[in-house]
Amino acid sequence: VLHYGQLDARLLLRVGGSMGDVYGQKVLKRDLNGYILNEEGVGLALENKETHLGSILPKMNMGWNLGFGYKGINLGMTFTGRFGGIVLSETQSVLNAAGVSKISADVRDAGGVPINQAKIDVRNYFQTIQTASVYYTYSATNVRLGELSLSYTLPKKWFANKLGMTVGLVGKNLWMIYCKAPFDPELTTSAASNFYQGFDAYMLPSTRNFGFNVKFQF
């Protein structure tokens, strides 16, 4: 059993299941008609109900490399994609409960969280569901421009045919084309276990990287 911070998610390996299956333990309490309970003087409440959230493992990883060359100029692009799987965000749950996230601001501006054809207090809602991982589970599917490189090989005649020289620029993680999670699904909280892949616990955002290179040929 592997726990995910303050969220109630647990990674469990069960008969008939698969490696990487994650289960949530609580959901908002509902009445017999399926409506979320919001009792006067009590407000919202959670109840125990184990829910299969999905697997942290992707169904497929893909990469696509493109290269173009013309008169010493070379352009290379690498697109990468991860399809399937889930990620969880403790960071988002804490920000929502504190009322400092964009989503909490949006629903506050809209007059409250819509539940049962009515709107309820934003603070009450987000503080109630703060530890319920079922509300902080996202698709891990993402597609990005992983690398872009541009290089130019200078004509050897510039160096009396005694030297070859190529200069280039390279950028990595430049463009997130598709991602529904509130953080980069490829980041990981812990290097000690691959099962923490895609668990966001106050991580720094991913960054773009730029580089310059020079290659000589004698």
Q: Residue locations for each model-derived region?
A:
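Membrane-embedded beta-strand positions of outer-membrane beta-barrel proteins
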Residues: 77, 167-169, 214
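Flexible, surface-exposed loop regions and adjacent strand-edge segments
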Residues: 1-8, 92-101, 180-193
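Outer-membrane beta-barrel pore domains and translocons
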Residues: 69, 80-82, 170-174, 217
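Conserved small-residue
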Residues: 1-56, 172, 176-182
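Membrane-embedded beta-strand positions in outer-membrane beta-barrel channels/transporters
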Residues: 63-65, 147-151, 211-213
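Outer-membrane beta-barrel "beta-signal"
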Residues: 206-218
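Extracytoplasmic gating/loop element in the C-terminal half of outer-membrane beta-barrel translocons
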Residues: 18-21, 82-172
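Repeated loop/turn-to-beta-strand initiation elements of outer-membrane beta-barrel proteins
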Residues: 72-76, 157-158
